[in-house]
A protein has these predicted regions:
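Short, well-ordered beta-strand elements within core beta-sheets of diverse protein domains
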Residues: 18-24, 265-267, 317-326, 341-346
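Rossmann-like NAD(P) dinucleotide-binding subdomain of oxidoreductase/dehydrogenase enzymes
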Residues: 91, 100-242
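C-terminal core of ALDH-fold dehydrogenases
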Residues: 32, 278, 328, 333-418
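N-terminal Rossmann-like NAD(P)+-binding subdomain of aldehyde/semialdehyde dehydrogenases
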Residues: 1-110
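ALDH superfamily catalytic-core signature
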Residues: 5, 127, 134-145, 160, ...
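Flexible, glycine/charged-enriched surface loops at secondary-structure junctions
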Residues: 25-29, 96, 172-179, 254-261, ...
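Short beta-strand-to-turn element immediately C-terminal to the catalytic PLP-Schiff-base lysine
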Residues: 234-238, 265-269, 325, 347-349, ...
Length: 419
């Protein structure tokens, strides 16, 4: 066993032991810890922002993209939002112990299906430091412990955030090992975590294709993927074009570095001549580059030709792919071929067409007359989120506290034996 694997295993074993205490703790205790963590984050703001400045300086020296730098950056407002998110999670209804089904058998057995924590959740993520606290808060609320491995570009920020959160755990009398951040970012830590079958119960990777592939290929424990967000907005022939303009500007430009930002706009040929010039002007105002099909380039002189690779790329920047399609069927085929099954939207006043789109698009979240930017645990009413799963098993879409539970069956008898 390598020295790194030994270190990771020791930290994971301690977190696993702490998971037992968290699972058996009361709702009041976990909520107290969350509120105390929020206050500790506020009190530690100078230290956290100083650590973040250190990471930002290193990121700029390394030449990280604007999108990556934006994901990394913290300021007073973003840190306050992180603290408020902890308090919001504390206000959520505790899923642990919830009875989801109950029934009586003819032989008199009473069977109950009850929600219980998963155990130890490993979360591997890249530059966005708010994930450190969001993940810790959701795991704690749902009765789990977590072991976190962040990206090297955010190490100092993540350590400062984790230290503040640990103060909240201690204030409530919970073991600080219940939220464990690996204090190193060696690449070998990823397969090391994934090898700990029997200690780590699930792994949730959040990041780019390289990270996702590395985790999936090496893990010996179950993986729930937070995959790429190649999201689409399809403007149908029966769309309200003013609504469509507002939605595409929001979906693309509000926060282009987010995984739920739109990457591709599909426009029905019937409205292309009237709508695409509107799109061109709106994107110019937002300083957004358009990469389009030949018809798009003819209608938007500032657009540059799109490649096939563009339509399969999560830009995470102010770049919008645009393609003219001739039918709903062509739009669906494009999304199913080039998309990532994350979030896709149709803009139309035709309910029949909308219902067909919602049924045919095999994505975690599908929208009718709304921005893809709503794919978010907070916007769905889940509180913060651990990730947005594009898988089909156990969890799909924003992963809130219920998605961090499993269940067990309680069977109550009066002496029954099986014949």
């Amino acid at each position: 066993m390598s020295e790194l694997l030994q270190r990771v295993t020791a930290l994971a074993r301690a977190a696993k032991a702490a998971s037992r205490a968290v699972a058996l703790s009361s709702t009041a205790t976990r909520d107290q810890a969350l509120r105390a963590a929020a206050q500790a984050l506020r009190a530690a703001e100078p230290a956290i922002l100083a650590a973040n400045a250190q990471d930002l300086a290193a990121a700029q020296a390394k030449g990280l993209t604007a999108a990556m730098t934006d994901r990394l950056r913290l300021d007073h407002g973003r840190l306050e939002a992180i603290a408020v998110a902890c308090e919001d999670v504390a206000k959520l209804t505790d899923p642990v112990g919830e009875v989801t089904e109950a029934w009586d058998r003819p032989n008199g057995l009473k069977i109950i299906r009850r929600r219980v924590p998963i155990g130890l959740v490993a979360i591997i993520f890249e530059s966005r430091p708010n994930v450190t606290v969001d993940a810790a808060a959701l795991c704690l609320k749902s009765g789990n412990a977590c072991i976190l491995r962040g990206g090297s570009e955010a190490l100092h920020t993540n350590l400062a955030l984790a230290q503040a959160f640990a103060a909240g755990l201690a204030a409530a009398g919970l073991p600080t090992e219940a939220v464990t951040l690996l204090p190193f970012t060696d690449r070998e830590a990823v397969p090391a975590l994934g090898s700990l079958r029997g200690i780590v119960d699930i792994i949730v990777p959040r990041g780019g294709p390289g990270l996702i592939e590395a985790v999936v290929n090496s893990a010996k424990v179950p993986v729930i993927k937070h995959d790429a967000g190649i999201c689409h907005v399809y403007v149908h022939a029966a769309a309200d074009l003013a609504m469509a303009e507002a939605i595409i500007v929001n979906a693309k430009c509000q926060r282009p570095s987010a995984c739920n930002a739109a990457e591709t706009l599909l426009v029905d040929a019937a409205v292309a001549a009237s709508f695409l010039p509107i799109v061109g002007r709106a994107m110019a105002t937002q300083q957004t580059e358009i990469r389009g099909c030949p018809r798009t380039c003819a209608l938007i002189p500032t657009a540059s030709p799109a490649t096939e690779a563009d339509f399969r790329t999560e830009h995470l920047a102010l770049v919008l792919n645009v393609k003219v399609v001739t039918s709903l069927a062509e739009a669906v085929t494009h999304i199913e071929t080039c998309g990532s099954h994350h979030s896709d939207a149709i803009i139309t006043a035709d309910e029949t067409v909308a219902r067909s789109f919602l049924a045919q698009i095999d994505s975690a979240c599908v929208y009718w007359n709304a921005s893809t930017r709503f794919t978010d645990g907070g916007e769905f009413g889940f509180g913060a989120e651990v990730g947005i799963s594009t898988d089909r098993l156990h969890a799909r879409g924003p992963m809130g506290i219920r998605e961090l539970t499993t269940w067990k069956f309680e069977v109550v008898g009066t002496g029954q034996i099986r014949g």
